[in-house]
């Protein structure tokens, strides 16, 4: 983040890197637990793994207070409009992590008539976490991958 330190004690950096550093250190996730993957998501937030070390400390119940949605579990056709409505209520910038085989592509229930074959058909997904169910470590790795993606974005439009 810091490009240069001058002898007078000044630190030089770009506006993009400061803003992106702040964004990565203060992710506010919103739970959208739909099945057994939600148990692993709660496990990741508990004391053993402590998501607070990675900047995703407090899970929010309101979409207006969150900028990260973790879709964990099987998304059925009846739940898809609710998922989209909650996503639309989130403030910009917003990110989505698809957690588990069912959220990624339907999983075990892929050929069922009532299951959406991937939540990316409803909302844009930034990071996919594989597994059935994925471990808490896999979710933490997915959050770290999202933080790296955020660091590469540009806040100021380039000419």
Swiss-Prot record:
Keywords: 4Fe-4S, Cell inner membrane, Cell membrane, Iron, Iron-sulfur, Membrane, Metal-binding, NAD, Quinone, Translocase, Transport, Ubiquinone. GO terms for cellular component: plasma membrane; respiratory chain complex I. SUPFAM superfamilies: HydA/Nqo6-like. It is a peripheral membrane protein. Gene3D superfamilies: 3.40.50.12280. Its main location: membrane. GO terms for biological process: aerobic respiration; electron transport coupled proton transport. Binds 1 [4Fe-4S] cluster. [4Fe-4S] cluster binds at residues 36-37, 102, 132. Pfam families: Oxidored_q6. It catalyses: a quinone + NADH + 5 H(+)(in) = a quinol + NAD(+) + 4 H(+)(out). Its EC number is 7.1.1.-. It is found in: Cell inner membrane. One of its GO terms (molecular function) is NADH:ubiquinone reductase (non-electrogenic) activity. The keyword Hydrolase does not apply. It comes from the Bacteria. Its cofactor is [4Fe-4S] cluster. InterPro entries: NADH_UbQ_OxRdtase-like_20kDa (IPR006137), NADH_UQ_OxRdtase_20Kd_su (IPR006138). NCBIfam families: nuoB_fam (TIGR01957), PRK06411.1 (NF005012). Belongs to the complex I 20 kDa subunit family. NDH-1 is composed of 14 different subunits. Subunits NuoB, C, D, E, F, and G constitute the peripheral sector of the complex. NDH-1 shuttles electrons from NADH, via FMN and iron-sulfur (Fe-S) centers, to quinones in the respiratory chain. The immediate electron acceptor for the enzyme in this species is believed to be ubiquinone. Couples the redox reaction to proton translocation (for every two electrons transferred, four hydrogen ions are translocated across the cytoplasmic membrane), and thus conserves the redox energy in a proton gradient. This is NADH-quinone oxidoreductase subunit B.
